[in-house]
Amino acid sequence: MTEAPTWEVDLFVDGPITLNRRYRTTQQKGFRPENPFYSDVEMAGIPSGGLRATVTARAPNERLAFDAAVVFFGRMLDALAFEVDLPLFLSLTEEGPRNSRVRHHSRQIIGHQLIKNAFRAADDLGMTEPAFLRSLGWYRKGLYTEDPLDKFLAFWNAIEIVAAGYYRTVESIDQEQAKKGSKNQIWGCFIALWGECERWPNIPGDDRWIAENYETRTKIAHGISPVDIETVTSVMNRLDVIQRVAHRFLWDWREEILHAGWDPASQSAPNSDDEALPF
């Protein structure tokens, strides 16, 4: 059988970040040790903010090559966006999510170790904790989307996916109660992670927070609430808190339950070759 050709795919990341030097790495893509494919990735900062990346992908046609590169690079971006907690939008064109590119006057300089760690985290989570990696994808969407309703749903989904995917694995959670639905699953996970409601970070003592936000989620997702100024304002008033709760929940779940936190001194992932380019 003829081997699929290898393509180069150009991708652009819009966001308040940059690299101080070009960066190149080779990463194993996919989880087939009997037939591994190594993807070359080269990245550079964009003066107005963001990154330009060229990713190699093996696929029978251009469309599938682009899709494969987006999934592969996007998972790394999910891990990176969560770590730096900044909106990072991935696209095929340099214009980004809006008609004209917005210049980011302040840009966090991303070190090469952060990029290495993000690739490694995406690879490890993809193999061992795919539900958690999917929740990071929703969290990144919550960071970059400009629609307040979509932003709320994305942050809620990030919480809900972890609760639904892992409550059965935590012995201290009341399994019979959790089976009644996502509100109970989230409640059980919060208790297991942080203790009683009075100790919950960002929402201490607010025992109505889960129920009220679940109701908001249901009204948005099912089109029950009219999309008027009152609804939008109400949702916007919830965004700051739900973002902080989602980030803290995912962070603590990763560290305390999954024990999958980043080691700042960790080396690059196995089967990778990294190089900082001098220009």
Task: List each model region and its residues.
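Terminal, compositionally biased low-complexity regions
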Residues: 1-113, 171-204, 252-279
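Amphipathic, oligomerization/interface secondary-structure segments
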Residues: 118-279
